[in-house]
């Protein structure tokens, strides 16, 4: 049962960890157009730090969401980085796209004039070593003056955050919007690993987070594929004598059921709360929620393109064995269309589906952690419905009911997998078995 309360403490905003290392390229949802005077300032178009599209002026500088978030996190932390190159990784006069270097990115934020005094931070954050240095620089204080933070606090240039529900909800939705851009980039990227790289779900959970591979590998060339390149989706078949088994894997054609589940697992690994769970509870939770999150993701991706069927990014359709199997694969599409789900609602609903404390066999400690996370995202969804829908509470209830559809859908898919797919998989050589799929479907 999901309960929605009207208060969330600022300290409870346990947001995706992906935000600390990457920049956002896509603009936030813009407000509804209103009457605008001709003297209205023009919105900046280019981030002065990384050169991507700017979302506005942040800390006195035209910048994107990613650079704003990066500068703030660096300011309130004690971490420091050194450039491993020549110190010019973010010099856009020497290159069109900056290199991935946190030291140079931080220095560029400072050099273009990002102002730490424009931040709202509490006294704990203001005591961080980076913030002290930047405040000293901004105020041009003497190096031996150790009272700069106190002076700034006394001058009320640092204030405690306003206890506003709207600002807290906005923080949550901004983070999820940014994370989703990374998830979609990963899904459409040229990164296409062989399933043999992963010995199983447990190995995948304990290995590095791969969401950033979307930026590293770039988009898959040649997508969408031509119809004659696609062919019907099918399970890998035992190779003919003398034929190399690697021929089952194509560099530009993905095994989408495997890759979509891989994407969902990497999505889960970006959440800070997830790393507070034990290895055992991570495995238990992921085995139960991965398929439901995947179904919601691919269903929403399809209806966002005005499609009533599941179409993957390369233009292919998912593998189905019969009408019952097909019906199970598209079960969640109609409810999403019926409730006219918005992007923010989808993002919050997916986070709620991920945070399921009712999964059997979870430890009491993990149930408590996950329950608090679910309430946080449920609160955000409820508040969003109230602010953006005339029928806010009924619409919220309709969205929450989709979770039951997703549960029934994944239960049917797992039963059909056991009936139709598992017998075929049992006949395959071990190196052709996608262990990540089997670990999730056999639960």
Curated annotation (Swiss-Prot):
Keywords of this entry: DNA-binding, Metal-binding, Nucleus, Receptor, Transcription, Transcription regulation, Zinc, Zinc-finger
A single BP term in Gene Ontology: cell differentiation
Residues covered by region (Disordered): 1-40, 225-249
Subcellular location: Nucleus
Cellular component per GO, a single term: nuclear envelope
Free-text disruption phenotype from the record: RNAi-mediated knockdown results in arrest at the two-fold stage of embryogenesis in the majority of embryos. These embryos have incomplete ventral closure and morphological defects including elongation defects, and either absent or irregularly placed seam cells in the head and tail regions. Surviving larvae also exhibit morphological defects and contain vacuoles.
Biased composition (Pro residues): 233-242
Entries under InterPro entries matching the protein: HNF4-like_DBD (IPR049636), NHR-like_dom_sf (IPR035500), Nucl_hrmn_rcpt_lig-bd (IPR000536), Nuclear_hormone_rcpt_NR2 (IPR050274), Znf_hrmn_rcpt (IPR001628), Znf_NHR/GATA (IPR013088)
DNA-binding region extent: 44-121
Main location as per UniProt: nucleus
Residue ranges with Low complexity bias: 1-20
Annotated CDD domains: NR_DBD_HNF4A
Family under the similarity heading: Belongs to the nuclear hormone receptor family.
Gene Ontology MF terms: nuclear receptor activity; RNA polymerase II cis-regulatory region sequence-specific DNA binding; zinc ion binding
Keyword check for DNA-binding: yes
Protein name: Nuclear hormone receptor family member nhr-60
Pfam families named among the record's database cross-references: Hormone_recep, zf-C4
Cross-referenced SMART domains: HOLI (SM00430), ZnF_C4 (SM00399)
Ranges for domain NR LBD: 196-439
Function noted in UniProt: Orphan nuclear receptor (Potential). Required for embryonic and larval morphogenesis and probably for seam cell positioning and migration.
Residue intervals of every NR C4-type zinc finger in the record: 47-67, 83-104
Species name: Caenorhabditis elegans
């Amino acid at each position: 049962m999901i309960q929605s309360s009207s208060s969330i403490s600022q300290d409870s905003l346990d947001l995706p960890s992906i935000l600390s290392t990457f920049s956002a390229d896509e603009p936030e949802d813009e407000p509804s157009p209103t009457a605008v005077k001709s003297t209205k300032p023009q919105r900046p178009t280019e981030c002065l730090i990384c050169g991507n599209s700017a979302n506005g002026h942040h800390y006195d500088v035209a910048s994107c969401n990613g650079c704003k978030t990066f500068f703030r996190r660096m300011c309130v932390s004690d971490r420091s980085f050194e450039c491993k190159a020549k110190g010019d990784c973010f010099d856009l006069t020497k290159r069109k796209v900056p290199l991935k270097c946190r030291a140079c990115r931080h220095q560029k934020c400072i050099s273009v004039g990002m102002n730490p005094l424009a931040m709202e931070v509490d006294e704990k954050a203001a005591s961080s070593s980076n913030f002290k240095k930047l405040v000293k620089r901004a105020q041009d204080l003497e190096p031996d003056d150790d009272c700069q933070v106190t002076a700034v606090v006394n001058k009320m240039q640092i204030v405690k955050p306003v206890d506003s529900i709207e600002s807290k909800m906005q923080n949550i939705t901004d983070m999820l919007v940014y994370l989703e851009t990374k998830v979609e980039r990963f899904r459409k990227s040229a990164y296409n690993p062989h399933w043999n790289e992963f010995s199983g779900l447990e190995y995948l959970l304990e290995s590095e987070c791969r969401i950033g591979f979307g930026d590293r590998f770039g988009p898959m060339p040649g997508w969408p594929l031509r119809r004659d390149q696609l062919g019907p989706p099918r399970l890998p078949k035992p190779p003919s004598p003398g034929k190399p088994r690697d021929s089952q894997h194509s560099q530009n054609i993905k095994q989408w059921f495997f890759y979509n589940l891989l994407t969902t697992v990497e999505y889960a690994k970006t959440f800070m709360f997830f790393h507070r769970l034990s290895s055992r509870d991570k495995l238990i939770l992921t085995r139960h929620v991965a398929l439901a999150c995947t179904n919601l993701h691919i269903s929403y991706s399809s209806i966002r393109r005005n499609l009533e069927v599941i179409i993957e990014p390369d233009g292919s359709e998912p593998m189905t064995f019969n009408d019952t199997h097909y019906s199970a694969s598209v079960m969640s599409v109609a409810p999403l269309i019926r409730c006219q789900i918005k992007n923010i609602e989808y993002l919050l609903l997916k986070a709620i589906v991920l945070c399921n404390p009712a999964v059997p066999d979870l430890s009491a400690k993990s149930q408590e952690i996950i329950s608090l996370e679910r309430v946080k995202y449920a609160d955000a969804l409820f508040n969003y419905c109230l602010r953006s829908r005339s029928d806010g509470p009924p619409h919220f209830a309709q969205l929450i009911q989709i979770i039951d559809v997703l549960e029934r859908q994944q239960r049917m898919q797992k039963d059909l997998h056991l009936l139709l797919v598992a017998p075929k998989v049992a006949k395959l050589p071990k190196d052709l078995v996608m262990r990540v799929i089997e670990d999730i479907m056999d639960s």
